[in-house]
Amino acid sequence: MITQLTRKIFGTKNDKLVKKYRQRAQKINELEAKYQVMSDEALKSAFTSLKESVQKGEKSLDDVLYDSFAITREASKRVLGMRHFDVQLVGGMVLHEGRIAEMKTGEGKTLVATLAVALNAMKGEGVHVVTVNDYLAKRDATEMGVLYSFLGYSVGVITGDLYGDSERLEQYSSDVVYGTNNEFGFDYLRDNMKYSLEEKVQKSHAFAIVDEVDSILIDEARTPLIISGPANRKLDNYKIANSVALSLQKEKHFTVDEKNRVILLTEEGIREAEKGFGVDNLYSIENAILSHHLDQALKANHLFAIDKDYVINNGEVVIVDEFTGRLSEGRRFSEGLHQALEAKEGVEIKEESQTLADITFQNYFRLYKKLAGMTGTAQTEASEFLQIYKLEVISIPTNVTVMRKDLNDLIYKTEREKFNAVIQKIKELNQKGQPVLVGTASIEKSELLHSLLQKERIPHTVLNAKQHAKEAEIIKDAGKKGAVTIATNMAGRGVDIKIDDEIRSLGGLYIIGTERHESRRIDNQLRGRSGRQGDPGASQFYLSLEDNLLRIFGSDKIKNIMDKLGLAEGEHIESGLVTRSVENAQKKVESMHFESRKHLLEYDDVANEQRKAVYKFRNELLDKSHDISHRIEDNRRDSLLNLLSKADILEGVEKEEYDLDRLLALFTEEYNTPISKELLEGKEYEALLLTLESHLKESYETKMSLVDENQKHDIERLIYLQVLDNAWREHLYLMDNLKTGIGLRGYNQKDPLVEYKKESYNLFIELIENIKFESMKALHSIQLRTKEEQEERQRAQEAAMQRLLSEMNAEANANLQFSHQPQSEVKVSRNDPCPCGSGKKYKNCCGQSGPKKGLLAQA
């Protein structure tokens, strides 16, 4: 209470910051008259001179901010017909300073971004603008591209339909690049699998502005980006595990904890499962894979629902993003869960994959020197943005006061009563022509509502993951007279719902939420579809005690109130107390999800340090000017020390005890280089090591003398890269396995994260050693040919090919000759070579008595 009073009197930190920004915006306004009178050419020239002063280092971006913003605003007026409001200038400054601008729907975030983009692109390092889908990336690049072009900037777009590296490289070479978070992230991973620096498409990570920043950095942060390949594991086990899972009974054989999304087998369930699999101990080491498959099969059948968590599309299981409601094409659940869902639905089971490269969005976006974001809903997650990304959220006032009325929630006992009330409300609004946007939490619920509206013969449009392609078109029309639009969470983010004067007089767009989402932000986004730029509107949520949020996370307080009131069929309760109880349930879930994301990040931070070290080394190998000869020298010695250890030849051991035969066998096998025993006999440890090192180096130098110095370096770098990539892939597989089982250490009173850090460090040391030894083995085993040998080999191949062609031509000619002459006219002497080309005399081949053979045989 006291805190709220203090805020009212003195203002919040946010209010004070906005006040300072407004004062700075006034200075930009003072420059407006100066640039208004300039011709287009003079305006362009003024901007170019600012750019040059920044690139020469004469001025900083902050020095030219006022002029840059003033010129960008004037250019926007001329080419787009849009002038930035003062609050939009504030938003531009917030973005430039690497913060998050929270701006309500319809406040023109796309236009705000142009101010920060135009300023930061002056450095010539490239600016990335990240959007949630390809449609928005293309739309914004096209619409804003006219402005950037006027200012002398090139614009690129990175979308899923760009397949070639050359096309992507061309787009990334632009001053301003629009694209989706997935495309930027995957390009980074693919770049770090390339074998040449020139093939890399992403050149820098200087500055990124993330549109709908909450959706990308919060909602999608639990899903890492993974490039994978086949893991070659048996697929039959998934079908067997699914049939065993279906034979088990809930409560009797297993318990389901929906809150924590965990399924546990009972003692009786374990026995039943062992019977189903035909094994004695489900949890023995040899059956570990079966217990894992069963766990995933139970989850697939009891925690994942079709048309809510996934859909079947063209015979494939496709994930539905729980926050956006969109289909996540190409994305698959990991750890065998996707295969378990395929077994459950009876579709083709695709091979389980092995990670080749991965990164979380948290760690990808932290690569940027400067990061900023914008969204309509960020304050509820302000602490997470600050903790994880060091991004401060600034709420920017609307240009016009929001007129939308946000009404209290209505709570019904059952889902049936709730939907009946929703239909009645839609009917009432539809009769007077007021447009309605109905938000649902899943495809299943949107299709239920669709069938109820059909029964009532109310015309409507459905927008869910199954109509993704028509999304923008459908959402644009949601503000028309009499429009009834049912939408899942996607609700066309980034697309404005505009209304005309007639709709304003009817009360504007009416929002009905049929369920509270686990996150308050998603509810606020739905509300934000109405009341843009001072338009009237209203929003209300209809809930029931059967909704997932209230059933799993809600307190008993609401249920007790409803029981005491003894509500009749169709009656509801509506009060601020109930709305607050619902928000408390949401806060619980948000807190749980935050812990989950934080947990994921803590684990990925461990892998991220290793990833950075490996990628840094990889980039050094790709750099042709980087000399790795000293590394080869060091590794050769380390490799030989390891070899001596394998042969049980250790420092301090008497030389008479050395097993030289074993050492010779290992040396020849490891390096494909023979060495005589006499060279090694009677030598002490250090002398023995030096002899081996000298012999190996001499052999290597002799081999490499067949090529010039540049070719030698290329061969060394290429072999190192191949060894590094193979070892890194294997390392990622081991890290995946480690992460899967590390949670069990908690039962042994050990912190799983601490254990993971220890174990992963040991694995990383093994990786480094493995790269050392395998690269030495590959380099010394390589077979090179001299130029003369190569030419001789080529001549031999050409001669062999020539002989083959001659024989084929001879046979073809013979075929032609005999096919055009009757047999009776063929006159061949008995001692002549047989015309069939066999090389035998005619009398011993086709001229023999008896049935004819070869070309002269009767058809």
From Swiss-Prot:
GO terms for molecular function: ATP binding; metal ion binding; protein-exporting ATPase activity. The keyword Transferase does not apply. SUPFAM superfamilies: Helical scaffold and wing domains of SecA, P-loop containing nucleoside triphosphate hydrolases, Pre-protein crosslinking domain of SecA. ATP binds at Q88, G106, E107, G108, K109, T110, D496. The keyword Cell cycle does not apply. It is an enzyme of class 7 (translocase). It catalyses: ATP + H2O + cellular proteinSide 1 = ADP + phosphate + cellular proteinSide 2. It comes from the Bacteria. Its EC number is 7.4.2.8. Its main location: membrane. InterPro entries: Helicase_ATP-bd, Helicase_C-like, P-loop_NTPase, SEC_C_motif, SecA, SecA_DEAD, SecA_motor_DEAD, SecA_preprotein_X-link_dom. PROSITE patterns: SECA_MOTOR_DEAD. One of its GO terms (cellular component) is cell envelope Sec protein transport complex. GO terms for biological process: intracellular protein transmembrane transport; protein import; protein targeting; protein transport by the Sec complex. Residues 818-838 are annotated as: Disordered. Keywords: ATP-binding, Cell inner membrane, Cell membrane, Cytoplasm, Membrane, Metal-binding, Nucleotide-binding, Protein transport, Translocase, Translocation, Transport, Zinc. Zn(2+) binds at C834, C836, C845, C846. It is a peripheral membrane protein. HAMAP family: SecA. Monomer and homodimer. Part of the essential Sec protein translocation apparatus which comprises SecA, SecYEG and auxiliary proteins SecDF-YajC and YidC. Belongs to the SecA family. This is Protein translocase subunit SecA. It comes from Wolinella succinogenes (strain ATCC 29543 / DSM 1740 / CCUG 13145 / JCM 31913 / LMG 7466 / NCTC 11488 / FDC 602W) (Vibrio succinogenes). The lineage of its organism: Bacteria, Pseudomonadati, Campylobacterota, Epsilonproteobacteria, Campylobacterales. The gene is secA.
